Amino acid sequence: MKEPVMRAIKDVTIDIDEPNTVRMNFRTKERVKRTIQRAAALSGLDDSAFTINAAYQSAIATIAAHEATLLQTTDYQAFFDALDNPPKPTDRLRDAFKRYSETVVSK
């Protein structure tokens, strides 16, 4: 039988050089709270540090996933080929640009 693996939790927010001055309040279900408290205790962190770390790491991963654009090799090549060798503007594109120029006032 395999031994359970204990995950080491590092407080990733400790390296952020600014004071803790902002509050976050939220409600949750009793079972969720108990589970978080148990995991926090097993990790050697208090409830707040554990919850903040988990939320912060998830936020960073979510932002990174949304900021990254992954392309297959063929798509990558087509994308950069189009940038390097753009097609000549069509009549419809010229008309659209003209309407835009007449409608939008730049500051």
Swiss-Prot record:
Source taxon at top rank: Bacteria
InterPro entries xref list: Ribbon_hlx_hlx, TacA_1-like
GO biological process, one term: regulation of DNA-templated transcription
Keywords: Plasmid, Toxin-antitoxin system
Coiled coil: none
TM spans (from-to): none
UniProt KW Oxidoreductase keyword: no
Subunit annotation: Forms a complex with cognate antitoxin TacT.
Function according to Swiss-Prot or TrEMBL: Probable antitoxin component of a type II toxin-antitoxin (TA) system. Should neutralize cognate toxin TacT (y4aS).
Family: Belongs to the TacA antitoxin family.
Name of the featured protein: Probable antitoxin TacA
Organism from which the protein derives: Sinorhizobium fredii (strain NBRC 101917 / NGR234)
